[in-house]
Amino acid sequence: MILGIDVSEHNGMIDWKYLKEWGVGFAILRLGYGKGHLDGRFYEYINGALGVGIPAGVYYYSYALQEKEARAEAWFSAYVLQDCGVTPERLPLGVWYDMEDADGWKSSHGMPDNEEITAMCGAYTKEMARYGYPCGVYASYDWLMHRIDRKQLSPYMSYWCAQWGSTCDFPGAAIWQYTDHLEIGGKVYDGHW
């Protein structure tokens, strides 16, 4: 298995060369969140990871409550990737649509039902595919099993499952987030296999 991390501006300055030497084999970087909010360190991170040869992917933390908002999040994602010159070929881990409610925003603004959550995942991933970017869905094990109707999405959809512990119970997870506390050089990251 290959060790990976995901990062956002909350991780601060990152020594990408050190991470590569330590054995990090891939990184998934937060591109942005919500209605057109760019992660404050995205350009720095994408250039840093690719600059030292760490294979990368990106994720977009969704605040969408309906399909049209999910499509707008995809348009913004594609715009940013094109703006920084990151073609699909330079992004081997693709694009991931982060569907969760970790900060309670969806709950406090009218949590969509499962049908709408599934439709938003489909809308974002289809829109990114139109731009040529392979795209999958990130969610917790619970959301993948109980909130997202995977039968309504493409049979070729990839899933990145967050389930902390020693095993991943989600069948066929492309990436498994096994911890939110992977310490490398005194800094803490989310860890993945």
Where in the sequence are the language-model features?
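Substrate-binding cleft of extracellular glycoside hydrolase catalytic domains
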Residues: 1-125, 129-131
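Short beta-strand/turn micro-motifs composed of small residues
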Residues: 60, 139, 163
